[in-house]
């Protein structure tokens, strides 16, 4: 049973994930052909987004998801709030709870920030506070990204169980990689992490995945390839000799794309560094599901908001989609 919050991919059972996928598909279908994309599902609910890091896809898709479900969506940013005057995250959280927030969606540079938010908003009265959804906390996790990636794979390949999925690039700094490894393992996939040793975290051998430093060798047996951006903003040293050498060894070029099976799907959580980890021709090819991921991001986040705010019944049973 899915909890009130979504803080980690590990919060989700296989049944939880499948229910979210099914409801995401239902919401997508319910919106087809509507001149005005509005469902009454969350009418009267207040959803507040708190983005302390830059974001395009995640922030926009959460806002669109809430608005398409008729929620009141309010954005709180450091620059335009008392955070810019030095207010702590805890005081901001308690203020938003007192103002009547039903859900708080947070992206923060500190790992564990979403957990603290959930604890703080519940501790004052001992009652359930607002639902908290982790939209990315430091290098820790990004569970809704893992959900939309997995849904995209399911739509493209028909199933996830037994599929061999490569996650390639900056594993060390990637919350997307961490959440995907956990969720894909829960769903029965075989996950292979491909990266130079310098971009693999300590303890990676204990993850439910195998590790390889040879990209070319892994491609012929891959069903899906998830490419990751090198997160230079989180680096303070030399993790590889040069951009050119990194791209040569770990970039998804046309030559490497030709090594993939014809059915394989290429994914990227964005933003893409074209010409570094992925060639433009590959990103724009028929095997690429990058824009499908963006579309699925809205529908998955609609489903997540539905589950944390309405309950564990499906959207179909509730008549919400």
Swiss-Prot record:
It comes from the Bacteria. The keyword ATP-binding does not apply. Heterododecamer (2C3:3R2) of six catalytic PyrB chains organized as two trimers (C3), and six regulatory PyrI chains organized as three dimers (R2). L-aspartate binds at residues 85, 175, 229. It comes from Mycobacterium leprae (strain TN). InterPro entries: Asp/Orn_carbamoyltranf_P-bd, Asp/Orn_carbamoylTrfase, Asp/Orn_carbamoylTrfase_sf, Asp_carbamoyltransf, Asp_carbamoyltransf_Asp/Orn-bd. Keywords: Pyrimidine biosynthesis, Transferase. Signal peptide: none annotated. GO terms for biological process: 'de novo' pyrimidine nucleobase biosynthetic process; 'de novo' UMP biosynthetic process; amino acid metabolic process. GO terms for molecular function: amino acid binding; aspartate carbamoyltransferase activity. Pfam families: OTCace, OTCace_N. It catalyses: carbamoyl phosphate + L-aspartate = N-carbamoyl-L-aspartate + phosphate + H(+). GO terms for cellular component: cytosol. Its EC number is 2.1.3.2. Carbamoyl phosphate binds at residues 57-58, 107, 142, 145, 270-271. This is Aspartate carbamoyltransferase catalytic subunit. Pathway: Pyrimidine metabolism; UMP biosynthesis via de novo pathway; (S)-dihydroorotate from bicarbonate: step 2/3.
């Amino acid at each position: 049973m899915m909890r009130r919050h979504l803080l980690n991919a590990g919060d989700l059972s296989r049944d939880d994930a499948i229910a979210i996928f099914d409801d995401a598909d239902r919401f997508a279908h319910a919106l087809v052909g509507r001149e005005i994309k509005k469902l009454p599902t969350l009418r009267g609910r207040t959803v507040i987004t708190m983005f302390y890091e830059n974001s395009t896809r995640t922030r926009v898709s959460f806002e669109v998801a809430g608005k398409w479900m008729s929620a009141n969506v309010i954005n709180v940013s450091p620059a335009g709030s008392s955070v810019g005057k030095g207010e702590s995250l805890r005081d901001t959280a308690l203020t938003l709870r007192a103002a009547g927030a039903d859900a708080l969606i947070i992206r923060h540079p500190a790992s564990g920030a979403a957990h603290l938010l959930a604890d703080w908003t519940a501790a004052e009265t001992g009652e359930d506070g607002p639902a908290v959804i982790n939209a990315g906390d430091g290098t820790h996790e990004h569970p809704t990204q893992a959900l939309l990636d997995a849904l995209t794979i399911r739509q493209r390949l028909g199933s996830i169980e037994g599929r061999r999925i490569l996650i390639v690039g900056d594993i060390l700094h990637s919350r997307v990689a961490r959440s995907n490894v956990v969720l894909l393992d829960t769903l029965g996939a075989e996950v292979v992490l491909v990266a130079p040793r310098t971009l693999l975290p300590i303890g990676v051998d204990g993850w439910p995945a195998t590790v390889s430093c040879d990209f070319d060798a892994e491609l012929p047996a891959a069903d899906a390839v998830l490419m990751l951006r090198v997160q230079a903003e989180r680096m303070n040293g030399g993790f590889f000799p040069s951009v050119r050498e990194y791209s040569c060894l770990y970039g998804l070029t046309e030559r490497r794309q030709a090594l993939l099976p014809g059915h394989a799907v290429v994914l990227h959580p964005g933003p893409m560094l074209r010409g570094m980890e992925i060639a433009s021709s590959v990103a724009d090819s028929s095997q690429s599901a990058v824009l499908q991921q963006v579309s699925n991001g809205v529908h998955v986040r609609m489903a997540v908001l539905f589950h944390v705010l309405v309950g564990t019944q499906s959207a179909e049973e509730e008549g919400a989609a």
